[in-house]
Amino acid sequence: DLVANQLDDHSASVCLDIGSNDGLFLQTLKARFGSEILGIDPAHAPAEHARSQGVETWEEFFSDDSVLRIKDRFKKIDVISANNVFAHNDDLISFATNVASLMHDGSVFSFEFSYLVDVVEKGLIGTVFHEHVSTHSLLSLIPFLNRCGLDLVDIKRIDTQGGAAIGFAKLHSAKAPVSESVANLLLLEHKLGLDTARGINIFRDRIMADKIKVAELLKPYAGETVGGFGAARSANLLIDFFELGPFLNFIIDDSPQKCGKWLNAFEVPIL
């Protein structure tokens, strides 16, 4: 709804969702705007489910080749979305440049990303793991988008994964007005010292203090039966950083795909 509300003033005749998963977001746009929709997602199971729900989905990565085929079919796209995709992409310059090439001056690009302010303020070490190759501040994001021909025109903070943000970008040629929220968050980032090493040092000091607290908390339970809850993607990172391996006897998870397996690098069974 947050993204859909942002699009009320924009034409949404053709919508593309990159990393479209089960197609639910595209279904929302189609129901609200009557849009022609297309999803791109390389994962077979969610792509197949999306197609079963009537959402056209190309089972592939967003690439130079897919961009050419999109242009052949639609010429330009009105709304492009990429929810929780930025952090997983190791070539953001090509990604954003390709997005910009599909846009016209009335197009909008909405994207969710891991927000550095939340990571620093809340000590979100669990978001820093092998699948997440980037975390952005606006201080880094704005010049990056400019390099790719895009301007950040609005920003909304959300609670996903402890703290993230949704950015809205338009082509630089559109000369679109910039929301006050962008300037407000830039001011906050300067106050937190994210334009220097100071802000990152605050994050380092916080998680090191948390590590000491966890060690003190677990010390009385050495030799006892200790279980964990949730074999999340970040579990290996947390176990390694907080040195939990010697204490954990098992981890409980409600995912049938994980039960009966072991955490990588640790002899901790998942029940």
Model-found features: residue ranges?
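Conserved class I S-adenosyl-L-methionine
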Residues: S11-N21, V226
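Conserved SAM-binding loop of SAM-dependent methyltransferases across substrates and taxa
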Residues: D22-F33
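Class I SAM-dependent methyltransferase SAM/SAH-binding core
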Residues: A31-S66, F250, P256-K258
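A solvent-exposed beta-alpha-beta segment
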Residues: R51-Q53, E216-L271
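A conserved beta-strand element that flanks and buttresses the S-adenosyl-L-methionine
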Residues: D78-S81
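A short glycine-rich, Lys/Arg-flanked "PGG" loop and its adjoining helix->strand segment in the class I
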Residues: I93-V108
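Short, glycine-/aromatic-enriched active-site segment of Class I SAM-dependent methyltransferases
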Residues: F109-S134, L138-L141, L145
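Flexible, glycine-/basic-rich loop-and-beta segments that form/coincide
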Residues: G162-I207
